[in-house]
């Protein structure tokens, strides 16, 4: 028997978030959405932790790099949540910095 995977998406573009949540939900994943960094960081301090964080780089309150840095500084298992950074920025240096800040992978937005 398989266990459903739980993801958290921190994304301020509501339309994109709705599409991702619907697509992943239709494929058997449970996805919670937070529209900003502050609510996302609060969610990451609750149990159960997500199996993956999908994190936008450009958010209205804190950027995704700062969210990633703060996540990695949290005590316990929260610091180990895998992070997939998602952004519209195409600069290769953004990828390098994102990975240095603790992201596990980095994908450009379509």
Which ranges hold each PLM region?
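N-terminal/domain-start alpha-helical segments
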Residues: 1-110
């Amino acid at each position: 028997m398989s266990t459903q995977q739980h993801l958290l998406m921190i994304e301020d573009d509501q339309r994109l978030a709705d599409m991702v949540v619907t697509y992943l939900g239709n494929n058997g994943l449970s996805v919670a959405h937070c529209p900003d960094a502050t609510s996302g960081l609060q969610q990451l301090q609750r149990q159960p932790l997500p199996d993956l964080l999908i994190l936008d780089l450009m958010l209205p309150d804190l950027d995704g790099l700062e969210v990633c840095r703060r996540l990695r500084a949290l005590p316990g298992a929260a610091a180990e949540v895998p992070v997939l950074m998602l952004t519209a920025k195409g600069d290769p240096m953004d990828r390098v910095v994102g990975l240095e800040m603790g992201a596990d992978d980095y994908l450009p937005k379509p």
